[in-house]
Protein backbone atom coordinates (compact mmCIF):
# COMPACT_ATOMS: atom_id res chain seq x y z
CA UNK A 1 0.00 0.00 0.00
CA UNK A 2 2.94 2.39 0.41
CA UNK A 3 2.86 5.52 2.55
CA UNK A 4 -0.87 5.71 3.13
CA UNK A 5 -3.11 5.61 6.20
CA UNK A 6 -5.23 2.46 5.91
CA UNK A 7 -8.29 4.07 7.53
CA UNK A 8 -8.44 7.68 6.30
CA UNK A 9 -6.43 7.29 3.07
CA UNK A 10 -4.03 10.14 3.88
CA UNK A 11 -0.94 10.00 1.68
CA UNK A 12 2.13 12.00 0.66
CA UNK A 13 1.31 15.45 -0.72
CA UNK A 14 3.42 17.78 -2.84
CA UNK A 15 4.01 21.51 -2.58
CA UNK A 16 6.63 24.25 -2.63
CA UNK A 17 9.30 25.61 -0.33
CA UNK A 18 8.81 29.39 -0.41
CA UNK A 19 11.78 31.31 1.02
CA UNK A 20 10.84 34.78 2.24
CA UNK A 21 13.27 37.54 3.16
CA UNK A 22 12.90 41.11 4.29
CA UNK A 23 10.91 42.81 7.01
CA UNK A 24 7.14 42.96 6.58
CA UNK A 25 5.60 46.36 5.78
CA UNK A 26 3.43 46.03 8.86
CA UNK A 27 6.61 45.97 10.95
CA UNK A 28 8.13 49.01 9.23
CA UNK A 29 10.10 47.28 6.48
CA UNK A 30 10.05 47.45 2.69
CA UNK A 31 7.97 44.28 2.41
CA UNK A 32 8.75 40.60 2.11
CA UNK A 33 10.31 39.34 -1.10
CA UNK A 34 9.79 35.76 -2.26
CA UNK A 35 12.74 33.91 -3.76
CA UNK A 36 12.75 30.88 -6.04
CA UNK A 37 10.13 28.24 -5.22
CA UNK A 38 11.44 24.68 -5.03
CA UNK A 39 9.36 21.50 -4.96
CA UNK A 40 9.04 19.46 -1.76
CA UNK A 41 7.00 16.60 -0.31
CA UNK A 42 4.82 16.58 2.79
CA UNK A 43 5.01 13.03 4.16
CA UNK A 44 2.40 11.44 6.40
CA UNK A 45 3.46 10.59 9.97
CA UNK A 46 2.63 6.86 9.84
CA UNK A 47 2.61 4.43 12.75
CA UNK A 48 2.14 0.65 12.79
CA UNK A 49 -0.31 0.16 15.65
CA UNK A 50 -1.86 -2.99 17.12
CA UNK A 51 -5.42 -2.81 18.42
CA UNK A 52 -7.12 -5.50 20.50
CA UNK A 53 -10.60 -6.37 19.25
CA UNK A 54 -12.58 -7.87 22.18
CA UNK A 55 -15.38 -9.26 19.94
CA UNK A 56 -12.87 -11.38 18.02
CA UNK A 57 -10.35 -11.88 20.83
CA UNK A 58 -7.54 -10.91 18.42
CA UNK A 59 -4.97 -8.19 17.90
CA UNK A 60 -5.20 -6.34 14.58
CA UNK A 61 -2.20 -4.49 13.13
CA UNK A 62 -3.08 -1.32 11.19
CA UNK A 63 -0.85 1.32 9.55
CA UNK A 64 -2.35 4.68 10.56
CA UNK A 65 -1.32 8.34 10.70
CA UNK A 66 -0.63 10.08 14.00
CA UNK A 67 -3.69 12.33 13.61
CA UNK A 68 -5.86 9.24 13.08
CA UNK A 69 -4.42 7.71 16.26
CA UNK A 70 -5.41 10.84 18.20
CA UNK A 71 -8.95 10.65 16.83
CA UNK A 72 -9.22 6.95 17.66
CA UNK A 73 -8.07 7.58 21.23
CA UNK A 74 -10.80 10.24 21.61
CA UNK A 75 -13.82 8.37 20.21
CA UNK A 76 -12.74 4.71 20.04
CA UNK A 77 -11.81 2.42 17.16
CA UNK A 78 -15.31 1.12 16.33
CA UNK A 79 -16.87 4.60 16.19
CA UNK A 80 -14.02 5.96 14.06
CA UNK A 81 -14.19 3.04 11.62
CA UNK A 82 -17.95 3.50 11.25
CA UNK A 83 -17.44 7.23 10.62
CA UNK A 84 -14.97 6.42 7.80
CA UNK A 85 -17.14 3.63 6.30
CA UNK A 86 -14.67 0.85 7.17
CA UNK A 87 -15.11 -2.48 8.95
CA UNK A 88 -12.77 -4.39 11.26
CA UNK A 89 -12.97 -7.30 8.80
CA UNK A 90 -11.04 -5.18 6.25
CA UNK A 91 -7.91 -5.37 8.44
CA UNK A 92 -7.94 -9.04 9.46
From Swiss-Prot:
Record carries keyword Ribosomal protein: yes
Protein name (database record): Large ribosomal subunit protein bL28
Keywords per UniProt: Ribonucleoprotein, Ribosomal protein
HAMAP family: Ribosomal_bL28
Any one Gene Ontology BP term: translation
Keyword Transcription regulation annotated: no
Gene Ontology cellular component terms for the protein in this record: ribonucleoprotein complex; ribosome
UniProt xrefs under Gene3D superfamilies: Ribosomal protein L28/L24
One Pfam family recorded for the sequence: Ribosomal_L28
Molecular function GO terms recorded: structural constituent of ribosome
Amino acid sequence: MGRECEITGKRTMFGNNVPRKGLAKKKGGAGQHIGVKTKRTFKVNLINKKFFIPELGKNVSIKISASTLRSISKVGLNVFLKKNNKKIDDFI
